[in-house]
Amino acid sequence: MAKQQTLHCSFCGRSRDEVKILIAGQEGHICENCVEHAQEIIGQELMIYPEAKATGNSHKLTVRKPIEIKKFLDEYVIGQDDAKKILAVAVYNHYKRLNQKIENDVEIEKSNIIMVGETGTGKTLLAKSIARMLNVPFAIVDATVFTEAGYVGEDVESMLSRLLQACNYDVAAAEKGIVFIDEIDKIARKSDNPSITRDVSGEGVQQGLLKLLEGTEVLVPPQGGRKHPEQKLVKVNTQNILFICGGAFDGIDRLIARRVNTHAIGFNVNKELQEFQAKNLLQFVNAVDLKHFGLIPELLGRMPVITYLNPLDAPTLRNILTEPKNALIKQFTRLFDIEGIALSFEPAVFDFMVEKALEYKLGARGLRSICESILTDSMYELPSQKVKTFEVTLDYAQRKFGTSKMSMLKVA
């Protein structure tokens, strides 16, 4: 009796016994593993993303009224009521225009936003919270990495690649998303006067942003910029994408003071201005100040909503530690709770953390670094010990912070 011939996959060489299915063709066979690999290759070449179809409903837009938007933001961001109101109205108007079904001759323009405020005052957190509430794709990009087309660096179009990646390449969802451009102040042109040398990472980038902000169809490399020149491009319409820009604009308070003082007349007015300056000059910021800082008029014209964030004082920082839904102390308490340890703090510890955050000029973002420097040793040691409770005293916090490397980083 003739020996039965063993069948093999013509692609990977596996035998019939090593695979689940072996599909026969005219002159060969293919196993289920090679079929899956072939499907992946086809998807990459033809820009077919099955997961985008599978998750298409996960980014269903849910628009709320301005009061509801602010109420939601109050749960995550402490203070900054003026900024919350302005953002709530701008976001509501932006997405309301998408739902208008009656065709008429009145075209409602986009409400792109600029937020001015010191580092750690909540610009990024506000934008993140809005995107979470609306259930839309969200991408954060750093303006400092962009350069004008043709120079080393990333093209401005690459920010849309991140938006596509955030929604599994669902173009329809991405076209209703939010892009937060951080450090927008770092691409300010160097002076108001034209320069002979080309400013490829400043004014050149601002010029590149104009069409994106206004609304246009862009061919986007889905894997990002210039590293994959062979990839297929995806067409994205930015007409309904909301752009929120944030920056510290260090020194803009002097420009505001100069402008406000110029229009002040009389001794009493100047006295009141001095009181205002002692508090927060950012409340007077407008497009004129941003233009003098270095943003081009064309860019400012496409970002009509300007808001400011107040510097954080001690009471606000104290509340940030404990009050929001995802407050820092709640996060660390939960981490210890997972280990079966009940974490508690002396009230004076919170005041100590706030004092250091103000002293080191770190804002709310610095509170986490301070918490980490105080609790790192306990998070390292306690999981290996049979401890059920742990209280952070003021003496413990001072000792641990004093021996940490962070204590050496004090701002002069």
Residue ranges and their predicted role:
Residues 2-24, 29-33, 40-79, 84-139, ...:
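AAA+ P-loop NTPase nucleotide-binding core of proteostasis motors
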